[in-house]
């Protein structure tokens, strides 16, 4: 195998051997010069244990070069032999210069050496020193080691890069570096995972010389075809700057043709660069539009999530809210990046250089025309010189100088645009954009990748929900088949059994029942006269010894008539009515006939009313007031269906009873504030700032009692964080009142302020400190200190199972999902109305299907109906 002949000073320096080593002084590759001819070198390569050696050919004219692996501590130990020349014995300032291409090496040795006064400080230059010969010496050998310290900044393209090492001496007379010898090899990355390439096949005549090690010669290449490069080899060359001839040709056909070609290329460059800038502006504008589109999409998701939280809110919380923020940042930053790093730099190059080509061309042509006109005049003069001719000759010389300068400037300008300095400026702009664009994309992908655990968690939640809904679907199908196969006769036979079952049920609960009944619009109507159209549907509620009828129950509850007091009433099946399933309620003031939807329902209503009548008599005997509003406030958790529905009716539909409701509210609210402060001493002061002034507000979803200043801060956080109510002006559900009774400020602060060590933090110097404290306490929850070891969702279910209200508040503070496994339904099934109310106030969904509704108690059904009614 042969290589390239070095025709310059080949006899001055000869590389006798090169040893590739590592940090532990292990020789990985040995290279020996086996040529005995002084005209060229022939190298033999060998490894320990006769391991194969890889070669790669980058350029056909260079021949194959050896491949080595880049590693920390890679060294090349050279054995160099210098020969004295006649008239030039010593070697002055022997220098080793390395590069990644012959062009780069040539530029370093010639142009950069001439222009850089600190050339010796270049990281690619190594000064070895002077080599001095004694008087009787004609040759001298030295050893010098080159290390790979500078390779840490080397750019490896496709896993490797060529290295060219050139030994040169300094010529004082010419003030330049004179190359003596060049050695090249190919470095691959140490972590490159690729199949080793087959050693480059050697020519036959070299294989005959040595059968154990391949040899590469610097002699001219022999005839014969060269095999293609090994698979996975890097490209032939790395991108390098275009070599430009700095000497312009004389003005003539060649110069004009070159200029004409440059002008055409520049014109095309002007057109395509202008279109490119417009396309980039369009892309930047598109990123702005995309930013607005994502904003609108996020707003749409948020609106629909407020309407249907179970379907959309988990998607927003676990993925899209954070992802949309990342998308917004990416689009804004990408638009800014395109504008600052592409559009503005390219437009500056276009406006200051490429756009002015016609002006520069016009100036050059005018100067050229003026010069050749002056030349014609100058040549038309006779050879006899006069004083005036000398003046004209000096003017002509000035014209010629101006023309040559103009020609030089125009030619240099055209060279800069066509692959020269301006082309390098464009490449620099694109490279800067590429680096920043990569960093931006990488950062955005990192942000998106961080959402992967949340997405996996969301998938697990959906999987569990799907399993639960499959069970619910099976229950619904079973219920539907039961409804299809059941008959009216069967229901009539089982009516008595159903009535007895309900009687046992009401013995355990309060005397409460609600349902759909038919009745006349007026209790005084004659049943024998009024036809079918006289019967109307009413939602009837039996609660605490009273029967309330509500009309228009499909849209909103409206109290139809005055409640019927059952203290002196009696109930019985209606005998004088031709319609079935009728019963009548008789009091000293009125007689009211109702029709149930089945015989079982009729018996159920009769049993419930009879039980309520007996209970009213007992309570009357004890002297206990049956006013439902007073019972709710004074005795805590005794609220039931009637008050709940009556409260909703008074709020949602104006009627003649509104004035009574207002009066009750005005008499009740002050007593609520007083009762809370009497029950809990901590409620006498604000839960956040400890002031005792105007403590008349509360955050019902935590729940805590607040002053007017702190309540304003709470209100600014939004209703999704805290729900503020006035203890003196607003009206509360009985369960909310019970929840306030059962907790108190100290109860809640043990959880939300358990981590405060320095209580000076609550001494607010200004409003900003107060606002920050409220946000830290309720929004960021930075003061919670808990040794709770369970998952908050699991802990929430356990608190419901054991009726542990404090643990439920703690789990919600730790981020438990209020809709986890239908926690509200589980609380209602346990008759735990305090935790159910706590969950509802914190946003729990009350979408209870019909099958589940039937399993709830009457009070639990009222709880759901009260909050599900629009």
From Swiss-Prot:
Residues 670-791 form the Arf-GAP domain. The modification Phosphoserine is found at residues 625, 653, 655. Residues 212-251, 647-672 are annotated as: Disordered. GO terms for molecular function: GTPase activator activity; phospholipid binding; zinc ion binding. The keyword Metal-binding applies. It comes from the Eukaryota. This is Protein csx2. It comes from Schizosaccharomyces pombe (strain 972 / ATCC 24843) (Fission yeast). The lineage of its organism: Eukaryota, Fungi, Dikarya, Ascomycota, Taphrinomycotina.
